[in-house]
């Protein structure tokens, strides 16, 4: 893989999760453009720099030796990537503190460097949280590849920071410069809430939760076919989002024990709050993690999963395949993985390579619900 070469450092970077023969690099031209701009403008060792949505630490690791840098993302994998890439390039793994996007920031910051996220609600929430966190004369610069830069990103910067000027495109990347202005303090529109009829629950969703304004159609197809009569089974909701699958299952299985896992800190925050609102003090484990990567082998009886098919702007089934492998390792012999997936993704064939038996539980014109037994 090529090195990220900037005026600040030459770095050998890896993506997360790691894959053999990884076809994609851990940085892009928008990272390079942003680093070059910071170097041309000038950065002092005393500067406090906040980096938002740095996918694998390309920006934060480049600047770590040149200023006081703090990174904030909504991704456990991004936080893990930052640590690994710092260590991989001869720095302490904790040289740059990482603050989950679900937690408050602590300024003042002289620079705010933003990689525009796929979910603009996350950007909006991050900009709202910047209120009162900027030092006098602070510089706020957002970067993206042109094909992933909607006009509304600039509109949000203008609404919450100040006037915006766009750069020329360089290597198909563009920068947005926002000049901070005094603003009326704004209240966040997040979290959002919606109600379900079956089960009759209300769900809260922080800004970066998938389908935060209503139940996604895959989950809606899955809910009627969640397993019942689980007794004291140990159940994991893998990629839990707002926790709806686990909560619905727990209502039907009052003695079962649940673990909810997602790589999004805001998803985990939403799931924990929804569990408490619906199930009170019933014991549960909710954690941000790389799926079931750290789950003890043979420690689960059932895994529920509505697998994602994209990581930011990268689309593919590599995350689903990884989840299936993790589920197989964590399940006891005879345990079962239940999933919902689009018909065209061919999950039945993939699961048949990993599990002893795969059966179709139900189907709709668009989705299939599958049960794979270890």
From Swiss-Prot:
InterPro entries (UniProt xref): DNA_methylase_N6_adenine_CS, rRNA_m2G-MeTrfase_RlmG, RsmC/RlmG, SAM-dependent_MTases_sf, Small_mtfrase_dom
Q: Which Pfam families match?
A: MTS
Source organism's superkingdom?
A: Bacteria
Q: Where are the transmembrane segments?
A: none
The family database entries (Gene3D superfamilies) matched by this protein are listed as: Vaccinia Virus protein VP39
Q: Per the UniProt record, which EC number(s) apply here?
A: 2.1.1.174
Q: Is the keyword Lipid metabolism in the record? A: no
Which UniProt key words apply to this protein?
Cytoplasm, Methyltransferase, rRNA processing, S-adenosyl-L-methionine, Transferase
Q: Which reaction does it catalyse?
A: guanosine(1835) in 23S rRNA + S-adenosyl-L-methionine = N(2)-methylguanosine(1835) in 23S rRNA + S-adenosyl-L-homocysteine + H(+)
Q: Which GO terms describe its cellular component?
A: cytoplasm
Enzyme class, broadest EC rank: transferase
Would the keyword Flavoprotein be found if you checked this record's keyword annotation? no
**Subcellular localization, as worded in the UniProt entry:** Cytoplasm
The GO terms describing molecular function are: 23S rRNA (guanine(1835)-N(2))-methyltransferase activity; nucleic acid binding
Role played: Specifically methylates the guanine in position 1835 (m2G1835) of 23S rRNA.
The text of the family note is: Belongs to the methyltransferase superfamily. RlmG family.
Q: Which HAMAP family match?
A: 23SrRNA_methyltr_G
This one is known as Ribosomal RNA large subunit methyltransferase G
